[in-house]
Amino acid sequence: MSSNPRHDSMHEFRVEVVRLMLDGKAEVAFGLLSKHYGIREPALRVGTVKRHRKVLACYVEKERRIYLSNSSFLTNPFVLLHEFYHHLRASAVGKSRQVEKRADQFAEVFIRDFLSWRSAIVGRKR
């Protein structure tokens, strides 16, 4: 366990965000993320967008909306966090520079903290 309170609180925040997403509460998780980063919440919709019909999900900057191609992605933290990163970047920069690698890394940090938390919980139960 880290002795850095800031690290611990960020770790707990990330765990909570992923738990909410896994529980099907993506909008609540987006609310927490948006408040944390000081930006407006993105809208969320299941459906596809012209020219992006073959992707799992996409962020449409003009609408400030995340589209998921399938409702099963409503509980997929990696997809949700990846698309939220695009919303965060567009909100902060004001440009649609879609940086896939950084979006993946953003999502992976949350997932890694959640998996670390979950393995610690499972370890305590043994």
Where are these regions (language model features)?
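N-terminal low-structure segments adjacent to metalloprotease catalytic domains
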Residues: 1-17, 88, 108, 112
